[in-house]
Regions:
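Active-site-proximal mixed secondary-structure blocks
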Residues: 1-43, 49-116
Length: 118
């Protein structure tokens, strides 16, 4: 049996729900970045994967804000060209989920949630 979808006929939300429901298992990454002023940002990502080992290439699906401005992670990566991908364990799953909340730019989510930056 074959099932097909006309992605252009689906809303953005419907496409998202379809993708996250069919591409499994999907590990969750807690991506940390630092802005130009040295402030840490942390955000969860389920859209990431290894594309190549040689050369090492990692894909990270960074979305923009609704007004198309960069979210903190995208902004920081563009400014510093540095980010860290942390694989989320069950022990920090709740904190990771809270990191996905909308914090004002410049707020250190790790500090807010008592997570340690190494």
């Amino acid at each position: 049996m074959t099932v097909s979808f006309d992605f252009m006929a689906l809303s953005e939300r419907e496409r998202y729900k379809l993708m996250i429901g069919t591409i499994i298992p999907r590990p969750i990454a807690l991506v940390t970045t630092v802005d130009e002023d040295g402030r840490i940002n942390a955000a969860p990502f389920s859209f990431f994967n290894c594309l190549s080992a040689d050369p090492p290439i990692l894909a990270l699906g960074v979305e923009n804000n609704p007004d198309m401005s960069f979210k903190d992670t995208g902004h920081n990566i563009r400014m510093t060209e540095v980010f860290t991908v942390n694989i989320v364990s069950f022990a920090i799953a709740e904190a990771m989920h809270i990191c996905g909340s909308k914090y004002p730019r410049g707020v250190d989510e790790l500090k807010e949630l008592s997570l340690i930056h190494i």
